[in-house]
Curated annotation (Swiss-Prot):
InterPro entries per record: Met_Sox_Rdtase_MsrA_dom, Met_Sox_Rdtase_MsrA_sf
Transmembrane segments: none
Catalytic site positions: 37
Free-text function comment from the UniProt entry: Has an important function as a repair enzyme for proteins that have been inactivated by oxidation. Catalyzes the reversible oxidation-reduction of methionine sulfoxide in proteins to methionine.
Catalysis performed (reactions): L-methionyl-[protein] + [thioredoxin]-disulfide + H2O = L-methionyl-(S)-S-oxide-[protein] + [thioredoxin]-dithiol; [thioredoxin]-disulfide + L-methionine + H2O = L-methionine (S)-S-oxide + [thioredoxin]-dithiol
Assigned protein family: Belongs to the MsrA Met sulfoxide reductase family.
Lineage per the UniProt record: Archaea, Methanobacteriati, Methanobacteriota, Stenosarchaea group, Methanomicrobia
Record-listed E.C. numbers: 1.8.4.11
Keyword Oxidoreductase appears in the UniProt entry: yes
Protein known as: Peptide methionine sulfoxide reductase MsrA
GO CC annotations on file: cytoplasm
Enzyme class: oxidoreductase
Amino acid sequence: MEGNEKAEQKNATSEESTDIFENPGEGLEKATFAAGCFWGIEEAFRQVKGVVATAVGYSGGHFEKPTYEQVCTLDTGHAEAVRVIFDPKVVSYKNLLDVFWKIHDPTTKNRQGPDVGKQYRSVIFYHNEEQKAAALASKEELEKAGVFKNPIVTEIVPVSEFYMAEDYHQQYFEKKGFLQNILRSFKK
């Protein structure tokens, strides 16, 4: 993403922008994905042209307003997730799905690399029936093409409550100076 575009992205920790994650506004849509540790996943989506805001948080569990420490105990059922606000005139939901499939291993259950636990599971949380259909179709397409050696274990489920993670997790790689080119193939 070019510098100007990145500067215009909303920051999940600024007070005036936190509402965008629940009510994106006219012409914008939201998507929610879980694919391992949310720090790298968020950074990958932040690099996509058309993504106007990202936030990391917890979704898919049964515990209200969990903390990072609670999610890590495996007792809450939440996955580390990323809420993505995007402009569908610039980037389609299908394009976001393509990013999702490429930035993690959707064939490992409750694990991504060295991170092990239910909070690291692969999940597409759909916000409407169109997203559900697109997610199911993209998964089926990958399975038919034999892209992965092992079966895809990604859950495709309706979005549940998204609880914003603590401020120190938001844009973690940027704050720590670990900006990565996770998506070199997705750059213009």
